[in-house]
Amino acid sequence: MLAMPRLITLSLCLFAPACLATCPNWDDARARQEIHQLQAQLAQWDDAYHRRGQSLVDDEIYDQSRAQLDGWRRCFVGTGAAPDPLQDAGGPLRHPVRQTGLVKLADEQAVATWIARRRDLWIQPKIDGVAVTLVYRHGALQQAISRGDGLTGHDWTANARRLAAIPARLAVPDEVILQGELYWRLDRHVQASHGSAGARGRVAGAMASNGLDRNTAARIGLFVWDWPNGPDSMNARLGQLAALGFPDTQAFSQPVETLEHARHWREHWYRQALPFATDGVVLRQEQRPPAERWQAEPHWAAAWKYPLRKALTEVRDVEFRIGRTGRITPLLQLAPVQLDDRRVRMLSLGSLDRWQALDVRPGDRVAVALAGHSIPQLDSVVWRHTERAPVAAPDPRRYHPDSCWRPAPGCEQQFLARLVWLGGRQGLALEGVGAGSWQALLEAGLLPDLLAWLELDAAALEQVPGIGKARANKLAASFARARQRPLAQWLKALGLPAKQLPPAADWDALAARDLAQWQAEAGVGPARAKQLQAFFRAAELPALRERLRAVGVPGT
């Protein structure tokens, strides 16, 4: 099977999110161990990609992992060089003109500086596909060469002849050398919404196959991004390419003069429907040096990548949040990473079961993505640190809807969550009372139970650190108004899992209901009926009822 070239990110590690962190505090032995592990992971991905045309990891995450390895090697110079990711990507055929990489511009300031120093510029979408060199002689396609290591590649001519996007003949007798991107055709693909959709891997797999079938061949297009021995004028190159049967280049090339022009087209191609996946834009200067002088990263072209859809980052800590009902939610504290316009420092794993299945621990590297409504979520665990840091998780048997009615040791989180619910909009809607207020009262030792605040007056509140006279008066007034709330509102504030209760609800009548009576209520099924019945049987509830009765809450 033919080896496949992986398009390695050649940008300086300075611009990669994975490299922005300081050097790890490792001794040499630990550094060698961690670097060796990451090298082995990258080697596995490279082997699958280059030899089998399989992409085992998202391209963004691969690029960031490679940048992370480069950063570690700079931190620990005595550990030896990492293998060249392209060492096995070369092939027996030499490119007639070197396949170059691209300098990556980190931000708008870098783009503005690059533009200001050049003239006669053009912008094109940066197609997320597989690079190829085409050689025509006497009008006939002679060779199609994989990118390989940029200098040599493999013979793709047989499969290239099966692609309708590559003409078998050109109406030009002279030698024509074209460099471009084979891409997977997509229907109205919006990069901002759909991401790369695995497009690059599909093309890589297809071109690695020994026999390309007709249906697959029809899905592969070609975007010619350079004609090394073509006309000097960009307009002439674009027009002649279209006439020769390569229309995409002209359709998706625009002249630019300013950062504003470049920003417009970058945003347009990011959010508008296109027939291919992209991962940024390419800025090109019309004038180029002779092809024999092209370098690995030319000064006359640069890439401005799109915001990351997936980012590689380090897990700094694993915390556990215990909610009002005893639900345990694992939270990952992350090394800050930018995703689109969000700075992500923390994300939720949703459930204790999921954390246990993933076994995420401090030091692990994870891929983070934005889900609906720009909510960060864990995409995958990319690799794990060799030394597994211990994590003490709460015992789920200890926490449930009937636990932590008082701030006993280990109950601080659930008890505070009960207070926040009680005072919030879904409960008593206590004006000016939030988590900070409850925390201050807890730290002052004034809340031995869930309703002890009913007995606090302004004088007592004023003694709490951080609560002055004016705020104490407001809190006392808010607490006093709570006594006038109806019983139904109080029961919901205490955690009764019912959407609606009769306005003139009576405690004794509700507590005496059996399962059938609860299920007679609209929207109450067997499970909810059991929860409602269990609520009134909670051991702490009689004492709370007495507090309500003492302050005159009707229906108690």
From Swiss-Prot:
<keyword id="KW-0520">NAD</keyword>
<dbReference type="InterPro" id="IPR033136">
    <property type="entry name" value="DNA_ligase_CS"/>
</dbReference>
<dbReference type="InterPro" id="IPR050326">
    <property type="entry name" value="NAD_dep_DNA_ligaseB"/>
</dbReference>
<keyword id="KW-0436">Ligase</keyword>
<dbReference type="Pfam" id="PF01653">
    <property type="entry name" value="DNA_ligase_aden"/>
</dbReference>
<keyword id="KW-0235">DNA replication</keyword>
<dbReference type="GO" id="GO:0003911">
    <property type="term" value="F:DNA ligase (NAD+) activity"/>
</dbReference>
<dbReference type="InterPro" id="IPR001679">
    <property type="entry name" value="DNA_ligase"/>
</dbReference>
<dbReference type="InterPro" id="IPR013839">
    <property type="entry name" value="DNAligase_adenylation"/>
</dbReference>
<dbReference type="InterPro" id="IPR012340">
    <property type="entry name" value="NA-bd_OB-fold"/>
</dbReference>
<dbReference type="InterPro" id="IPR004150">
    <property type="entry name" value="NAD_DNA_ligase_OB"/>
</dbReference>
<dbReference type="GO" id="GO:0006281">
    <property type="term" value="P:DNA repair"/>
</dbReference>
<dbReference type="GO" id="GO:0006260">
    <property type="term" value="P:DNA replication"/>
</dbReference>
<dbReference type="InterPro" id="IPR013840">
    <property type="entry name" value="DNAligase_N"/>
</dbReference>
<comment type="function">
    <text>Catalyzes the formation of phosphodiester linkages between 5'-phosphoryl and 3'-hydroxyl groups in double-stranded DNA using NAD as a coenzyme and as the energy source for the reaction.</text>
</comment>
<dbReference type="InterPro" id="IPR020923">
    <property type="entry name" value="DNA_ligase_B"/>
</dbReference>
<keyword id="KW-0227">DNA damage</keyword>
<protein>
    <recommendedName>
        <fullName>DNA ligase B</fullName>
        <ecNumber>6.5.1.2</ecNumber>
    </recommendedName>
</protein>
<dbReference type="Pfam" id="PF03120">
    <property type="entry name" value="DNA_ligase_OB"/>
</dbReference>
<comment type="similarity">
    <text>Belongs to the NAD-dependent DNA ligase family. LigB subfamily.</text>
</comment>
<keyword id="KW-0234">DNA repair</keyword>
<dbReference type="InterPro" id="IPR010994">
    <property type="entry name" value="RuvA_2-like"/>
</dbReference>
<feature type="active site" description="N6-AMP-lysine intermediate">
    <location>
        <position position="126"/>
    </location>
</feature>
